[in-house]
Amino acid sequence: MASHQDQSYKAGEPKGHAQEKTGQMADTMKDKAQAAKDKASEMAGSARDRTVESKDQTGSYVSDKAGAVKDKTCETAQAAKEKTGGAMQATKEKASEMGESAKETAVAGKEKTGGLMSSAAEQVKGMAQGATEAVKNTFGMAGADEEEKTTTTRVTRSSARTE
């Protein structure tokens, strides 16, 4: 029987070697898989860090540019406001000057017209008194004193035009 046991032992020996080899290979594969996993995790972390850093730099750049645009816009708006204010002031001054000139012209016209109207009124009054006296004289209603006072007022074109 010893030979059967020897054969059995010798037959199991390669199987044991195969199992041991398989175990060693499995352990080696596990180690390599773990190393690959660690390497991938490390690379992913590094990529994430670079992405965050890049995002921060980009955000800072965009923020700086946006601030510069905002500042430039404010400056432009302020300049436009100042220009408009200056134009408004000039327009107000010009309108005030024109209003004052119109007022002076109106006053001068009023004075001139008033003088003409006063002169014309005096002439009409004188003519009416002359006509009244003439009618009284015609009908003999005038007294002796009034007959001597009768005067004739004439209106000529040159006296009506006083400038």
UniProtKB/Swiss-Prot annotation:
Residues 1-117, 139-163 are annotated as: Disordered. It comes from the Eukaryota. Residues 152-163 have a biased composition (Low complexity). Residues 32-115 are annotated as: 6 X 11 AA approximate repeats. GO terms for cellular component: nucleus. Residues 28-56, 67-84, 91-113 have a biased composition (Basic and acidic residues). Transmembrane segments: none annotated. Sequence repeats lie at residues 32-42, 43-53, 65-75, 76-86, 87-97, 103-115. Keywords: Repeat. Belongs to the LEA type 4 family. This is Late embryogenesis abundant protein Dc3. It comes from Daucus carota.
